[in-house]
Amino acid sequence: MRKTFRIKKPADFQIVFNKHQSVANKYFIVYHIDKPEQKHFRLGLSVSKKVGKAHDRVWVKRRIRQSILELKSDLPHDIDLLVIARPAVAKQSQKFIKEQIIHVLKLADILKVEDK
């Protein structure tokens, strides 16, 4: 995923936190805000130390990024997403993580497709 598609600055994270709409399931919390002036969506990730050691957290981040990248064409372009991983996601498979990402994005009414 290109760096222009990522939320990196703490100020940008705070904007999403403060003006957010949120949805959660057992594995993820998703905060999102609409940004009509944007040309593409942006993604911010947060994986706490409760998820596991550093290599576990990086593994989870990679799986989330890959899942979002596969859904890129079905996401609106004018949105900032902040995905927070809960500890239950630590030892799950890539397929399961993608299913849960799809589930939480549908709950948030963000995903445009019915099923993938």
UniProtKB/Swiss-Prot annotation:
Q: What is its EC number?
A: 3.1.26.5
Q: Where is the signal peptide?
A: none
Please give the GO cellular component terms listed in this UniProt entry: ribonuclease P complex
Q: Which InterPro entries match?
A: Ribosomal_Su5_D2-typ_SF (IPR020568), Ribsml_uS5_D2-typ_fold_subgr (IPR014721), RNase_P (IPR000100)
Q: Which GO terms describe its biological process?
A: tRNA 5'-leader removal
Q: Pfam families annotated for this entry?
A: Ribonuclease_P
Gene Ontology molecular function? 3'-tRNA processing endoribonuclease activity; ribonuclease P activity; tRNA binding
Q: Keyword RNA-binding: yes or no?
A: yes
| Gene3D superfamilies for this protein | 3.30.230.10
Q: How does it assemble?
A: Consists of a catalytic RNA component (M1 or rnpB) and a protein subunit.
UniProt family annotation: Belongs to the RnpA family.
NCBIfam families cross-referenced by the UniProt entry? rnpA
Protein name (record):
Ribonuclease P protein component
Organism field: Leuconostoc citreum (strain KM20)
